[in-house]
From Swiss-Prot:
Organism per entry: Escherichia fergusonii (strain ATCC 35469 / DSM 13698 / CCUG 18766 / IAM 14443 / JCM 21226 / LMG 7866 / NBRC 102419 / NCTC 12128 / CDC 0568-73)
Full protein name: DNA mismatch repair protein MutL
GO cellular component term of the entry, any: mismatch repair complex
Keyword Nucleotide-binding applies: no
Segments of this protein annotated with the region Disordered: 362-397
HAMAP family reported in the protein's UniProt record: DNA_mis_repair
Gene Ontology terms for molecular function: ATP binding; ATP hydrolysis activity; ATP-dependent DNA damage sensor activity; mismatched DNA binding
Length: 615
């Protein structure tokens, strides 16, 4: 078959396959056109679930006679004219495909009148070439679109329509979503001559909750928490149901709008779900009606045929913004106090450790304790320094302090006789700055290492905590602060505020920058190791810790933070283990020479080898 240009009707029918899925799709496209035309009242008449008739009447600006024929042509629109317009769309429609596609699979009639015309005009397209006929008609200012016999000329598509009740329920849901997007528009919906829905316009400054209750039900309204959250060009408004009262019925209420456009966006849903996860069960879903306003240049709506999805240019920023907005209103409603009492603190949020392989956990012990001899004896050059004492040593072991510590560890201790080397210790007691080669991951969080024929197990979570403490502890210069895209604002008591002000200089050395006013504190920057943490939980716990202290030493604060950071790895991979050990060897060379308890355990394979040889 030779290459040829498709006839207009066939081309439009192909496009209709994407745009017109069912009668509800037609209603959505036509009502959005009415909203773009500035309508304040829209009447929707449906017969037989939309298969027989869909009539949309509005009081918008109307269409001029000269433009009626173009309105039914494909890729004809008044909403964009250049690429710049496409990259900053503010209208609901913009492709110019809807009317042409709908008219190709139905008998469509368009009647319209503008305010400066004396009479109305009616247009309809028919025939193989979709020729448009225009004739005079009687009609007030505005537009009426009638769609008769949907899919009459595509029997295969018509066969897939569901029952009349099911199709109307889909239309009803579309109108609910649109009514929640535009409180300023009156929308009436009727089916088979009976009025089903009447959504009256809410005057400016009026009670939007009345329409919210009519659409989402009184149960949602009773447990709805209002959200008003803003940062830069981002604004989040709306309501989220209290997760403590979420039911399967309420969980069906998940409406999200981006610049007034109804969306089904996984990124937004994930941010909301993450904010509510501590209050929801594994099989529960949050209920919400949220409106996100964003600079049109920062969002691409031209990524889905039916415009159900969008793509954000700064998706991480949008995700964190929504997450913090929802979490903030939930915390304000719950009024969770900061941990200032004498109740026992929760255990550090880390993955379970292989205690048999890792030995004692120094981070689970008090910061001040008697020195404990290291699991591996240090080399003579180390001066016999107890390994368990240097986590509290000052200054800390930042990257720039590595050379200083190497010199300290290599300073010979006077009047000390060298020890006879033990069989399995030269690999760690020598001057080498490497743990060895990673062979595999054992028990999900331990690395099996080999060096010079000696095998050992290394507890990766413990190594990760030592590394974080090294990264957090300031040396000659303060730790580099990383500004937050969205500053974290928390309510604090007078005691907490006083403790923060006393610890401000110490926190600044750790890279934590904040500003306090009245009853609130705003965290503006944190060090790099804290960027991927849940700051909504960690920072209040840190404030609670500081409120109990009388002396604020950066090293002690860094050690507390390192103990309470959440591990980023539930299941370690070889690549992650190799990267971690490389960082530890670079920033904490002392761990290689003098491994602290709980970090490294030698594995003696000789008995197993001997047993195999004896068989």
């Amino acid at each position: 078959m030779p290459i040829q240009v498709l006839p207009p009707q066939l081309a439009n029918q192909i496009a209709a396959g994407e745009v017109v899925e069912r009668p509800a799709s037609v209603v959505k496209e036509l009502v959005e056109n009415s909203l773009d035309a500035g309508a304040t009242r829209i009447d929707i008449d449906i017969e037989r679930g939309g298969a027989k008739l869909i009539r949309i009447r509005d009081n918008g600006c109307g269409i001029k006679k000269d433009e009626l024929a173009l309105a039914l042509a494909r890729h004809a629109t008044s909403k964009i004219a250049s690429l710049d317009d496409l990259e900053a769309i503010i209208s609901l429609g913009f492709r110019g495909e809807a009317l042409a596609s709908i008219s190709s699979v139905s008998r469509l009639t368009l009647t319209s009148r503008t305010v400066d015309q004396q009479e109305a005009w009616q247009a309809y397209a028919e025939g193989r070439d979709m020729d448009v006929t225009v004739k005079p008609a009687a009609h007030p200012v505005g537009t009426t679109l009638e769609v008769l016999d949907l899919f009459y000329n595509t029997p295969a598509r018509r066969k897939f329509l569901r029952t009349e009740k099911t199709e109307f329920n889909h239309i009803d849901e579309i109108i609910r979503r649109i009514a929640l997007a535009r409180f300023d528009v009156t929308i009436n919906l009727s089916h088979n001559g009976k009025i089903v829905r009447q959504y009256r316009a809410v005057p400016e400054g009026g009670q939007k909750e009345r329409r919210l209750g009519a659409i989402c039900g009184t149960a949602f309204l009773e447990h709805a928490l209002a959200i008003e959250w803003q940062h830069g060009d981002l604004t989040l408004r709306g309501w989220v149901a209290d997760p403590n009262h979420t039911t399967p019925t309420l969980a069906e209420i998940q409406y999200c709008y981006v610049n007034g456009r109804m969306m089904r966006d996984r990124l937004i849903n994930h941010a909301i779900r993450q904010a509510c996860e501590n209050k929801l069960g594994a099989d529960q879903q949050p209920a919400f009606v949220l409106y996100l306003e964003i600079d049109p240049h920062q969002v691409d709506v031209n990524v889905h045929p039916a415009k159900h999805e969008v793509r954000f240019h700064q998706s991480r920023l949008v995700h964190d913004f929504i997450y913090q907005g929802v979490l903030s209103v939930l915390q304000q409603q719950l009024e969770t106090p900061l941990p200032l009492d004498d109740e026992p603190q929760p255990a550090p949020r880390t993955i379970p450790e292989n205690r048999v392989a890792a030995g004692r956990n120094h981070f689970a012990e008090p910061a001040v304790r008697e020195p404990v001899a290291p699991r591996y004896s240090p080399a003579p050059a180390s001066g016999g320094r107890p390994a368990a004492s240097w986590p509290n040593a000052q200054p800390g072991y930042q990257k720039q302090q590595g050379e200083v510590y190497r010199q300290l560890l290599q300073t010979p201790a006077p009047m000390q006789k060298p020890k006879a080397p033990e069989p399995q210790e030269p690999a760690l007691a020598a001057n080498s700055q490497s743990f060895g080669r990673v062979l595999t991951i054992v028990h999900s969080d331990c690395a099996l290492l080999e060096r010079d024929g000696n095998i050992s197990l290394l507890a990766l979570p413990v190594a990760e905590r030592w590394l974080r403490q090294a990264q957090l502890t300031p040396g000659e210069t303060p730790v580099c602060a990383q500004p937050l895209l969205i500053p974290l604002r928390l309510k604090v008591s007078g005691e907490e505020k006083s403790a923060l002000e006393k610890a401000q200089s110490a926190l600044a050395e750790l890279g934590i920058d904040f500003q306090s006013d009245a009853q609130y504190v705003t965290i503006r920057a944190v060090p790099l190791p804290l960027r991927q943490q849940n700051l909504q939980i960690l920072i209040p716990e840190l404030i609670g810790y500081l409120a109990k202290q009388s002396v604020f030493e950066p090293g002690n604060i860094a050690q507390w933070i390192a103990r309470n950071l959440m591990s980023e790895h539930a299941q370690w991979s070889m690549a992650q283990a190799i990267t971690l050990l490389a960082d530890v060897e670079r920033l904490c060379p002392q761990l290689v020479k003098t491994p602290p308890g709980g970090l490294l355990q030698s594995v003696d394979l000789h008995p197993a080898i001997k047993a195999l040889k004896d068989e």
